């Protein structure tokens, strides 16, 4: 997962999976346009080197549709055929269903919207970087921990850590500063787990 738009160290991950014959499934949901800066010999975008790459195009993403949408990419023909079938109710041919699948076909309206918005992704990511740089320069309080992001981070979220959360929230509210919680709970704290 390239959390908050910051590239994970794919070089290190690929070394581990190569030794263990594991496929790499790349969660690119928050990293549209991020460069893999763990490998300095090439400047490939996140999602272009894994066995399977998944992109969420939920409206709140850096590249978002107007409704739920997503993309899966692969250069493996076997994976491609299975994914194509699963996203079309398990169908391999018209009226032939070999698998249990779901209706996950991207509709034409969402495709048109995304195609138009894609043209602005680079420009919008640059704007996010400029804003993040302003935060980095101006958040000087040593009680606020700023995360360390990759060089090509596209800042899906700008995240900070604070010890006295409730006190900090009151300060933000009093100062009329907008804030939010991206992940209010760790996944292992949820009832399902």
What does each model-identified segment do?
Residues 1, 6-15, 19, 31, ...:
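PLP-dependent aminotransferase class I/II
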Residues 21-23, 52, 178:
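Proline-centered loop/turn at the N-terminus of a beta-strand
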Residues 35-52:
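Radical SAM/AdoMet-radical enzyme domain recognition
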Residues 27, 56, 182:
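A cross-family glycoside hydrolase active-site/sugar-binding cleft signature
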Residues 11, 44, 68:
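Active-site phosphate/pyrophosphate- and oxyanion-stabilizing loops and adjacent acidic/basic residues
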Residues 48-82:
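Active-site PLP attachment segment
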Residues 1, 25-26:
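Hydrophobic residues in beta-strands of the RecA-like P-loop NTPase core, especially within AAA+ ATPase
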Residues 30-32, 63-64:
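Short gly/pro/ser/thr-enriched loop/turn and capping motifs at secondary-structure boundaries
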